[in-house]
Design a protein with these regions (language model features):
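Short beta-to-alpha transition helix within the HATPase_c
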Residues: 9-27
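Conserved ATP-binding N-box helix of the HATPase_c
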Residues: 45-69, 124-127
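Glycine-rich ATP-binding loops of the HATPase_c
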Residues: 126-137
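Glycine-rich nucleotide-binding loop
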Residues: 95, 137-146
């Protein structure tokens, strides 16, 4: 019997995270989350689902094929330089997924299915005027995705952000 954990104060984001936590537990993958309160309130449910399901699908597939089997999802609000929502996903990865030109190489068996997840992520990032960077760390065999959403460019931003994580 699986008990849902409360990892987010947003019910949809909590459900998405719990789906992947359950899948990871079943496959021996360590998944850690640190999701601060009210960090994704500006995003529609459709966009939140598209963004986080695609990010976590990609991370899950890569971690499953790696020898360390790790995923980490962090979402926080920071005011270090300006008001920003920072989404970071880090996962173990068996090999560098970029070709020599910096393009992602698909590991999917069907080439027809390649790229839709990344395009969906890029669509959401662009819609909310964010920036995304992805890189592979050869030394640690980890893939990193960093997404920044800037308060100044997000419609319907709520100012009630907290620096505290939810109790797990």
């Amino acid at each position: 019997l699986h008990t849902n954990r409360v990892v987010s104060d947003n019910a949809l984001l909590n459900a998405i995270a719990n789906r992947y936590i359950t899948n990871c537990e079943a496959d021996g993958i360590s998944m850690r989350t640190d999701i601060r309160t009210k960090v994704c309130e500006f995003m529609s449910d459709y966009d939140m689902t598209s963004l986080f399901c695609n990010l976590l699908d990609n991370s899950y597939e890569a971690a499953r094929k790696s020898h360390r089997h790790e995923i980490e999802l962090n979402i926080r609000y920071t005011t270090d330089l300006r008001d920003i929502i920072l989404v970071t996903v880090r996962n173990s990865c068996a090999e560098n997924p970029f070709d020599k030109y910096g393009n992602l190489i698909s590991t999917k068996e069907s080439p027809a299915k390649h790229g839709y997840g990344i395009k969906s992520i890029e669509r959401v990032v662009k819609k909310y005027n964010g920036n995304m960077s992805m890189y592979f760390d050869d030394e640690t065999s980890t893939f990193h995705t960093n997404i920044l959403f800037y308060k100044d460019f997000i419609p319907n931003w709520h100012n009630e952000h907290s620096a505290l994580p939810l109790e797990n």
